[in-house]
A protein has these predicted regions:
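A conserved mid-protein helix/loop that constitutes part of the nucleotide-sugar donor-binding site
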Residues: 22, 208-231, 241, 248-254
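Nucleotide-activated donor-binding/catalytic signature segment of Leloir-type glycosyltransferases, i.e.
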Residues: 254-272
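Conserved acidic donor-binding segment of nucleotide-sugar-dependent glycosyltransferases
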Residues: 325-326, 330-336, 344-350
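A short, well-ordered alpha-helix in the C-terminal region of glycosyltransferases
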Residues: 265, 352-366
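Short alpha-helical donor nucleotide-sugar binding micro-motif in glycosyltransferases
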Residues: 149, 271, 279-285
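Short hydrophobic beta-strand element within catalytic cores of glycosyltransferases
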Residues: 310-314
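Short acidic/histidine- and often glycine-rich active-site loop of Leloir-type glycosyltransferases
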Residues: 127, 315-326, 330-331
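Aromatic "clamp/platform" in nucleotide-sugar-dependent glycosyltransferases that forms part
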Residues: 293
């Protein structure tokens, strides 16, 4: 098998930080380290420095749409960009966003005649509803999205639930589950690192610590968590809770926690871009609370598992697809009463938490190297 050159196209890429940008970075890294070649194509961004990547990054003209969609949207009709891309001997185009990136990918395919793959990462119906309020325009945006995706030779989704969501938008083609990975190695960080991240917080020994890492948005199930913690406190159960992250709803979330009288045991800290700091938080916690039905893959659940930390998830959610209740994680109904009842029980069962955390590491952890190598094997079939 000869070395391949893969074109990776996405709307977001560092310095923009989101789950899909992280996926593209890891695809580029793992493909390059395997001996193949990767080229990332992404919109220009003010102050972006791509010199630290081990693969080429081609930036094309963009429009600042931060207020609407949270990032700079690419302008996919740049002839100069197309001429630059045509100089690369691409064997396959792998697109990770169904909007401007997909338009660019389709135009490039029309020029160089190579196969295309699309990965569906996000429930775009929710993003569309948040960005566009007119129902008729929402339906038009969904149709455009589905038309773009349907044009690819093969469609991947990061979970079965993501595939079902794509089907609900009107997509009628086939899809294949290709899960994303985690950029953490299996195992814990040194205890000195754990003590360093939590030294400014009141986290007594022998008191269970719950954790959330991610965007501070209500649709992540944060109200369920806070209401459950209120019930836990009223029931006299000792605990601490740490939220790590930022997001558009953070101020409201903090205010609601204070309103519930949880300020003495629920703490908020800003997002951490040092991955070892995030790993240290996973290692300090006793249980990860993630009652989100929005996420298509729940990578944070696999990150937690890398550090032997079990998660509480909503039964039937995408994040819970690989979870067996009480074996490698814990499942609840999508309400605060269900979470509170489980936490009240687990607060007094530290050995159960440790056992289930170890099993989570064994059963649901997948590294980015393994995930991308699986993708590369599939590339060969598509090519």
């Amino acid at each position: 098998m000869s070395n391949r050159t893969i074109c990776l196209i996405n709307d977001s890429f560092p310095p923009v930080t989101d789950g899909v940008a992280n996926a593209v970075v890891n695809y580029g890294r793992a493909i390059t380290e395997s001996g193949d070649k990767a080229v990332v194509v992404t919109p220009a961004y003010p102050g972006a420095d791509d010199s630290g990547f081990s693969f080429p990054v081609v930036r094309y003209p963009s429009i600042d749409m931060t207020k609407l969609v949270g990032y700079h949207a690419g302008f996919p009709f740049s002839e100069k960009t197309m001429q630059t891309l045509m100089e690369y001997p691409f064997d396959l185009i792998h697109c990770h966003c169904p909007i401007t990136s997909a338009v660019l990918a389709r135009e490039l395919r029309a020029r160089i005649h190579v196969p295309t793959v699309f990965t569906y990462h996000t429930k775009f119906d929710i993003d569309i509803a948040n960005a566009i309020h007119a129902k008729l325009l929402q339906e038009g945006a969904k149709k455009l999205l589905v038309d773009n995706i349907s044009a690819f030779d093969e469609v991947w989704t990061v979970s079965h639930g993501a595939g079902e969501n794509l089907r609900s938008l009107g997509y009628q083609g086939d899809w294949r589950v290709m899960p994303n990975g985690v950029d953490f190695a299996r195992g814990r960080v040194p205890e000195t690192d754990v003590h360093a991240v939590c030294r400014d917080f009141d986290l007594p020994e022998n008191v269970p610590v719950f954790l959330f890492v991610g965007r501070m948005m209500w649709y992540k199930g944060l109200r369920i968590t806070l209401d459950a913690l209120k019930k836990l406190k009223d029931g006299g159960h000792p605990f601490r809770m740490v939220f790590v992250g930022s997001g558009g709803d953070k101020d409201e979330v903090v205010a609601y926690a204070n309103e519930l009288g949880l300020a003495d045991r629920v703490f908020f800290t800003s997002p951490k871009y040092d991955r070892n700091v995030i790993r240290a938080w996973y290692c300090r916690a006793d249980l990860f609370l993630f009652p989100s039905t929005f996420d298509t893959n729940g990578l944070v659940v696999r990150e937690a598992a890398a550090c032997e930390l079990a998660s509480v998830l909503v039964r039937g959610s995408c994040a819970a697809e690989d979870i067996t209740d009480g074996k490698n994680g814990f499942l609840i109904e999508e309400n605060a009463d269900s979470m509170a009842a489980l936490l009240a029980k687990l607060c007094h069962e530290p050995e159960v938490l440790k056992r289930v955390g170890r099993q989570a590491q064994e059963e649901i952890y997948i590294s980015w190297d393994d995930a991308v190598h699986r993708a590369q094997r599939r590339y060969e079939i598509v090519i």
